[in-house]
Curated annotation (Swiss-Prot):
The keyword Signal applies. GO terms for cellular component: extracellular region. Might be involved in the inhibition of growth of fungal competitors and pathogenicity. Belongs to the thaumatin family. This is Antigenic thaumatin-like protein ARB_01932. It holds the Pfam family Bys1.
Amino acid sequence: MQFKAIALTAIAAITPFTAAVGHAIVENHCDNNAYLWSVGGSVGPQQTITPGHTYSEQFRYDPVSGGIALKITRVKDGIYNGSPQTIFAYTLTDTNTFYDLSDVFGDAFAGTSGLLVSTSNPDCPDIWWPNGVPPTGQKFTSACQRDADITLTLCAQPPK
């Protein structure tokens, strides 16, 4: 009986912890499709984000890599053919979600209005890339409470 009480107490203590997790969201405000792969210890299937639509996943911890990279290209099968990639990555901890933005193999969204990473918590910092290109000398890693949603907007307008 004592074991059941301890087990129930442990489950009750863990439940709010696991329930209070935000989402990684990618909004496509561009005129063309964007292609996304969720990558941790393995590569998830290609997701097509059509103009005006959104991709969302609940923050999760990957036991193999520790974090998740949402790899985004402007061409189908882009992570397999050397196309420029924008990487919106996050790492979930007990209290925070660390997030960052980077490019590999070129700047996938160069020449667009911009890329904006914003959160549902106004106290957490934005990441803004005018013209879809990382500004020189700017920090691109930030943190927010783990229950906040964090959104990357493709072809975004400047933050207010």
